[in-house]
Amino acid sequence: MDSGSKKKVLVAGATGYIGKAVVAELLDRDYIVFAIVRKENQLEYSDQSNLNVISLEIGKNSDWTKQLPKIDIIISCLASRSGCEHDANFVDYSLNSDLLYFALKIELQHFILLSAICIQKPKLAFQRAKLRFNNTLMSSGLRYSIVLPTAFFKSLSGQVNRIKNGKSFLVFGTGKRTSSLPISEIDLAKYIVNCIGSEESWNKSLPVGGPGPAVTPIDQAEMLFKIFDKPKKIKHISPRFFDFVLILLFPVSFFSQKIKDKLELIKIGKYYAEESMLFYDADADAYDASKTPQFGENLLYDYYCSLRDDPDKIPDMGSQKLFS
């Protein structure tokens, strides 16, 4: 484990699922951390001398150089909550661009970006926004590391309450078309912080998943039925469900921003029902678990067990929830 050597690290998105874990990992390694929070948010950590929780408005009109000491490293864990076009353009592109503007102004040492492996096949608004900023960062002249994780444990927890309550597990098609190498927030945070001192991670895009084997939706169902000791009930839904809803809503979307946003959420659901969260081999036109770099030691099965043992830890999926 590398030591922070009193380097100053600014974490944007410090209140998020991965951002909180990154802050904790940095503190464990003795970095001096500046965690950005919005004025309306609260970030609660145990009292640590190396932690500075600051309220800043992200934007080019805000002169951060007057509010912050010289920062050595920026880690951006910013991500839009909904994935809708206006939200994605603002958070995934514009706010990150403002961070980059600040980084160039202070001659930053290293910019580490948490992105997503799904940008390999961009079909959605948030993927295009992420990819647009990734390209901007790569051409900026700054040292960068762009981390492309697979699925988070939290992302594969949307049906835990269904199984806990004796309901069926819902899959699209056979439930075996897609797979992922899910990674825990703790392991991903370690990987992100490792990028600071690992020259092999500099100026690269870095796909990363958790320890294998790859997991399909059917595999998730089998785990949950076993862990919660519930009878196996799997309901198969035709992937055409998404196409039907898209056709139904498309004409109305021209007249309603709310419907347009709903349309984008349906597209997101369709994407994840059809695409694996693994390294995409463009030459073979196929996802490949064997070519997806693996990191960490935490397993999805053990995570599900922890949710059984402490139901209060079952995450609230919010706007990301597809199944109720």
PLM feature spans:
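Glycine/proline-rich active-site loop of Rossmann-fold NAD(P)-dependent oxidoreductases
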Residues: 155-162, 195-206, 229-232
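Non-catalytic, hydrophobic alpha-helical segments
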Residues: 18, 74, 188, 192, ...
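N-terminal Rossmann NAD(P)H-binding glycine-rich loop of SDR-like oxidoreductase domains
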Residues: 2, 6-29
